[in-house]
From Swiss-Prot:
Region feature Disordered, mapped onto this chain: 36-85, 628-650
Organism of this sequence: Chaetomium globosum (strain ATCC 6205 / CBS 148.51 / DSM 1962 / NBRC 6347 / NRRL 1970) (Soil fungus)
Residue ranges of the TM segments: 95-115, 160-180, 193-213, 217-237, 320-340, 351-371, 412-432, 449-469, 484-504, 518-538, 557-577, 586-606
Family in the record: Belongs to the ATG22 family.
Role noted for this protein: Vacuolar effluxer which mediate the efflux of amino acids resulting from autophagic degradation. The release of autophagic amino acids allows the maintenance of protein synthesis and viability during nitrogen starvation.
Cellular component, GO annotation: vacuolar membrane
Coiled-coil ranges (or none): none
Membrane topology value: Multi-pass membrane protein
Keywords from the UniProt entry: Amino-acid transport, Autophagy, Glycoprotein, Membrane, Transmembrane, Transmembrane helix, Transport, Vacuole
This protein's record includes keyword Transmembrane helix: yes
Name of the protein this chain belongs to: Autophagy-related protein 22
Record bears the keyword Transport: yes
Location in the cell: Vacuole membrane
Gene designation: ATG22
Comp. bias (Low complexity): 56-72
Length: 650
């Protein structure tokens, strides 16, 4: 670095080679895409002069409105990178899949209800192992005894049958998510896999129409397939979120207006071709431009841009959650109408699930039409294989990448803090929902239509929460992680309220502490309102911490943490039910698992995590940024990379 007092410091750089840009163009071919890369009618070339630095940011923005979507885009990071600005139609495609698939989560409570009903129809009382069990909605139907069913020669409580089924499904889901993460991050597979899993899951849900009393094991298999497909598809959907935000026109404009010295780019007028060549040797540019080694660095304005991206990501994520909840609320009302009209039989529950699957399949079509594939960098090994060999190569590389991603994540403090908290929090969310539904059905003896009303209230509150938490956080000046902490505090009310039933004086009242069916409804409102905030804020917060270029790989780690933890929660609750014969003791476990994530979330620093992620992105395949010698020699910037290089060289 040249000292400030050196007389050579004020000397301008040598005149650039006037036609070196065009010489560079001769070494590259313009990017072209087949129709499989395009979203409906948006088939504009992504190869532009602006990608090679010929057009200034100001001009590219002015031209973006004239019809070429490539102008104003960020420069490509790898061959085939789709750098077109995010369009309203592409966002609509992303929202469309949330509208299609979120109904599975919201209406999916009918699956454990149906599984418990089918298991109970095949079960016997534990007291004599001969007497058939009655309906769980009948307070006297089981004579107060536990009901068990034989599965593969093992005795299982019918209330825990669904819990074990979902534990198995999330275990398989975690393995599947790892295997497909590489195909999603590399090449043009992200969208294809999303649609494939969407339609596989929807068909599995529709097949419940054929599940009768004697096919309850088949019903459990369908639950595993549908839940696995749903989880895999949402990992792929979530991996689109950072890309949609990164290429959003608002972010591109913010990026173009930022220079390293913090001044607005509009303060420096673009030079025309002849003027620029005539004055190329004159020291007319500010010192910041002369010393700039990286046109995309945001040294003094990183916090502002990070905050803007996080806000936009939160808005898009929350809107997607809200749209999905609206779809679920409508379908819940339809489901309750079907249950009432068909007398609350298992047949009516199967019809409801068929409608849910059909909804999922039909509304996936708009996502297929409008969502762009946004391909990732090509995998070098895949060029040598085709067909099944290519799939094996992708799978092998995916598992190898997982261990590398874990190594990378270990160097990102805020990623590790978030994943640790999310491991516990996601388990609490999934386990609380299924435990509450089974508690209402088996302990409070609520009818299926009444259980449907729980979901309606929860969904309506979720819609309110999805659109209200952003206002609450702005009003109270809360950061993203502080909003998550507020949601956790409200969430803790649910298990603590269930534990009130153990207090002798509350038990003598015969009300409060979940002793009456109506008490489920206000708790459902709390659960929905909390989930509306957690779903959007956790997803967007994590997206801001991910190193650019590895969205699917890190969202696979996110899903493994999410779904992998859900293996333990339902299994532990199932073991508690088998040991105690009732569900209420499980609230002790839920109270602990809801509160434990709070200290980890509190320690997250978004700005620090974003900075570390960008530094680490340099060693992840498919992402390279040219840095100035000054920045390359900076010890702080190289600290993470040096440690990683040492590990990979071993």
């Amino acid at each position: 670095m040249v000292p400030r007092n050196d007389p050579e410091a004020g000397r301008p750089p040598l005149a650039p080679r006037l036609f070196s840009r065009f010489s560079q163009l001769s070494k590259h071919s313009f990017l072209s895409y087949s129709s499989s890369f395009e979203a409906d009618d948006e088939r504009s070339s992504t190869g532009s002069l602006e990608n090679f630095g010929i057009m200034s940011p100001g001009r590219s923005r002015s031209n973006s409105g004239s019809g070429s979507s490539s102008f104003g885009a960020l420069p490509p990071r790898y061959p085939g990178d789709d750098t077109r600005p995010t369009s309203p139609k592409e966002l609509a495609g992303w929202y469309a899949y949330a509208f299609a698939a979120e109904v599975y989560v919201i209406c999916g409570s009918f699956i454990p209800i149906l599984l418990e009903s089918l298991a109970r129809e095949n079960g016997v009382l534990l007291s004599d192992r001969k007497t058939p069990c009655g309906s769980s909605s009948d307070k006297n139907g089981d004579n107060g005894g536990q009901c068990i069913v034989y599965v593969l020669g093992m005795e299982i409580n019918t209330a825990s049958f669904a819990m074990y089924t979902f534990s198995i499904s999330v275990l398989i889901q975690a393995l599947l998510v790892v295997s497909i993460s590489c195909a999603a991050d590399h090449g043009n597979y992200r969208k294809k896999l999303l649609l494939a899993f969407g339609w596989i899951g929807s068909i599995a849900v529709m097949l419940y129409i054929f599940v009768s009393k004697n096919l309850y094991i088949f019903g459990a298999l369908l639950a595993i397939v549908s839940n696995t497909s749903f989880g895999a598809s949402f990992v792929l959907l979530n991996s689109f979120l950072p890309l949609l935000v990164r290429h959003h026109p608002e972010i591109i404009d913010k990026e173009a207006n930022i220079v390293p010295n913090g001044q607005d780019a509009q303060d420096h007028e673009d030079l025309d071709g002849e003027t620029a060549m005539a004055d190329s040797t004159a020291a007319l540019l500010p010192r910041g431009s002369l010393e700039d080694g990286n046109a995309l660095s945001r040294v003094q304005t990183r916090e502002e841009l990070t905050s803007h991206e996080l806000n936009l990501s939160t808005q898009v994520s929350a809107k997607g959650i809200g749209i999905g909840y609206i779809a679920g609320l409508f379908l819940q009302c339809v489901a309750i109408f079907i249950l009432i009209q068909m007398k609350n039989t298992t047949w009516s529950q199967r019809v409801v699930l068929f409608v849910i699957g059909a909804w999922w399949a039909i509304f996936t079509v708009p996502a297929a039409m409008w969502l762009r594939p946004r391909p990732g960098p090509p995998l070098p090994a895949s060029s040598r294989h085709t067909g099944i060999r290519a799939f094996i190569a992708y799978t092998f590389y995916a598992w190898k990448s997982l261990f590398r991603t874990v190594q990378l994540a270990r160097r990102l403090v805020d990623i590790m803090l978030f994943l640790g908290g999310w491991f516990l929090l996601s388990d609490a969310i999934a386990t609380t929902s299924s435990t509450a539904i089974l508690f209402a059905k088996t302990q409070l003896h609520m009818e299926p239509w009444a259980l449907g009303m729980i979901n309606v209230i929860s969904t309506a509150a979720g819609i309110t929460g999805a659109f209200s938490w952003s206002y609450i956080s702005r009003r109270l000046h809360l950061q993203a992680h502080q909003t998550i902490l507020a949601c956790i505090a409200l969430f803790e009310i649910i298990p603590l309220y269930g534990l009130l039933g153990y207090l002798p004086f509350v038990k003598n009242w015969g009300v409060f502490g979940l002793q009456q069916p109506w008490e489920m409804y206000p708790l459902a409102a709390v659960y929905g309102f909390v989930l509306g905030g957690l779903s959007g804020y956790c997803r967007s917060l994590y997206g801001e911490l991910i190193p650019p270029g590895s969205e699917a790989a890190f969202y696979a780690l996110y899903a493994i943490t999410d779904k992998g933890s859900s293996v333990f929660g339902p299994a532990i609750v199932g073991a508690i039910i088998d040991a105690s014969g009732e569900i209420r003791p499980a609230f002790w476990f839920l109270a602990a698992i809801v509160g434990l994530p709070a200290p980890l979330i509190w320690c997250i620093n978004v700005e620090r995590g974003r900075s570390e992620g960008e530094k680490l992105a340099e060693v992840i395949e498919g992402f390279k940024v040219t840095r100035s010698p000054e920045r390359e020699s900076d010890e702080e910037s190289r600290a993470i990379l040096d440690v990683y290089d040492e590990e990979t060289d071993r």
